[in-house]
Amino acid sequence: MNAFTQQIAQELNLNINSVENTLQLLNAGGTIPFISRYRKERTGNLDEVAIGHIQERFQQLGDFQKRKESILHSIDQQGQLTPQLKSRIDHCQEPTELEDLYLPYKPKHRTRAQIAREQGLEPLASLIFLQREPHPEGKARAFVKGKITDNDTAIRGAQDIIAKTINEDEQARKEIRNIYRHGAIITSKVLSKEKDEEKAQKFADYFNYSEPLKHCSSFRLLAMRRGESEGILKVSVSADDEDCLSHLNRLFIKGQGACPNLVHGAVEDAFKRLLKPSMETEFSSLSKEQACERAIDVFADNLRQLLLAPPLGPKRVLGVDPGFRTGCKVVCLDAQGNLLHHEVIKPHPPVNDYSGAAKQVEKMVKDYQIEAIAIGNGTASRETSDFIHGLQFDHPVQTFVVSEDGASVYSASETAREEFPHEDVTVRGAVSIGRRLMDPLAELVKIDPKSIGVGQYQHDVDQNELKKRLDQTVISCVNAVGVNLNTASKHLLSYVSGLGPVLSQNIVDYRKENGAFTSRSQLLKVPRLGPSAYRQCAAFLRIPNARNPLDNSAVHPESYPVVRRMAEDCGCTVNDLIREPEERRKIQLSHYVTDTVGMPTLTDIMRELEKPGRDPRNQIEVFEFDPNVKNLDDLEVGMILPGIVTNITEFGAFVDIGVHQDGLIHISQLADHFVKNPGEVVKLHQQVTVRVLELDHTRHRIALSMRGIVKR
């Protein structure tokens, strides 16, 4: 059994066998999507979240063990490793406890205490610290020599040694840490010389602000830290000094007299010069780390919602990147997203060629039999939407407004240049907008998630940790939906379980050379795609109209024999099982349970037979803004308006109501009941009905509310 299995099982409240089997599968190279979907019998039906937590905790414990080994080696090299100390380090459970144990042995720059020791003052420090000598000044005379010119200098040196001892005392650090944990205050003050600058005003709420650190939300803490990094604010973390000193005095001072008085001075020095700065640094770092983790959670949750947004599906689309001066870039895409045609229209100021633009669009819609129009939500979006809605088409055409966050990043990227080497960035951007309507997931995987604009303080968090979490989110979403093996780009394929950039490129190259895949088993002919990668990826790849209908389902090829046996027992074909509910009702799942195939897998198989390759995403809905509200001046307090959720943060949700400025629904205005997490009430791109609560024309701020309103 793995050394960490029992601890992980206890911490996560999971079955020990489930944890052990999961670690074995992970260590064997299994991906989280594959393990959660196709190894349910071994994991005890753990979901992706639980498996991810096991993997993360295993990594943390491994790193912690390496740190222990490094510390043991360092202390051993110094010749100070005792059996008792080794045992304490081996059994240590917390990183802070481990570092406290190491602190007395940690190599340091030359300190005041070290200088005092070199001057031979350690015996005097020990005598004073024992607090039994009634006349320490007299004893100090014996140490007056060399650079120690008098009694006071000797005693101060001895106090430096005592202060170091107090600072490194495990119990002292534990008690002071506990005071900070429960009572630390975070304080923010404006730097006076920056107060009146325009850039400082966005931090005005924190010019003179304080609250208990344990209650400080991640967005407030990160806002203060950003203000600090921009030179606007001074931020500090502190606790009650008197409370801390009281605890230290109780620990170290014994009675009254000359020596206890000297120790009292050393206690104050130890706290103010060593312990206090150490704790302030520790809790500043810890609180920011926790705030960053929460911010990354919010970003990952938002990204998941964006990636799993409802797709229009394979329809012919007109993609429009709106603009005023340079016009609107318009592209015609076929049902697979291929670019057929593009041109520019200029219905808006300064050109105002409304009639010419109308003829252009109506002709494109007719010539290319366009079924839907996707309009980017940036500059001139509302005006372009109104323009499109005023046109007459000879067949029904749906119109959608699509988020264009990151489209400009894509249009200038290597990926876009590969796809459209002969088109400029404006055409590429319009294509991206059109494709996002057809299949948001397939298009958004081409863009760095950090460019999509659905996070909070994303530039203030650990960028490596952010990338790791966002990549995990993309992988989870891609595999949850499944990928069309014959149409997917190399970028989309690279996120499929068991693949990656090299194998995904090899699949695309094989497809170009040999034509469309007709069965999953052909994947084994792709260069460098062996049995292990095939086992990991096959069930997440779909082949519509394949010879074997299971190749267009989430049934794993290793389970095909089970399905064939079911069909044989029912006296029908696999196709019949899929088409006929009557045939499926004949199946007794218990008859097919084996050592490796249990009820969880069999239940999943039946669900897939009912609807092979089902898409977990919702159906897309058409949305329209209030036609009477087009800019900030049209708004009035009390108005009830339709809107689209564009971003979700810890403090609320931003909503586009069609006036070129998103409004904010504060968390307290999201519902008639208490809301702890905005994500429990609203989702990205959700259509909502809101009431205008407050308007600030100077700062272009709109406060909205959903309280007392029936959600759409």
Per-range role (PLM):
Residues 178-185, 320-324, 378-383, 402-409, ...:
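A glycine-rich phosphate-binding loop feature that marks nucleotide/adenosyl-phosphate handling sites
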Residues 38-40, 129, 240, 322, ...:
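Short, ordered loop/turn segments at secondary-structure junctions
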Residues 50-53, 60, 64-74, 78-319, ...:
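Duplex nucleic acid-engaging cores and interfaces of nucleic-acid transaction enzymes
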Residues 15-16, 28-29, 95, 109, ...:
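Short flexible coil/turn linkers enriched for glycine and charged/polar residues
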Residues 543-712:
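Single-stranded RNA-binding regions, centering on S1/OB-family and related RNA-binding modules
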Residues 74, 88, 98-101, 227-240, ...:
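Structured, non-catalytic alpha/beta "coupling" segments that mediate domain-domain communication
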Residues 1-20, 27:
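Generic start-of-chain signal for non-secretory N-termini
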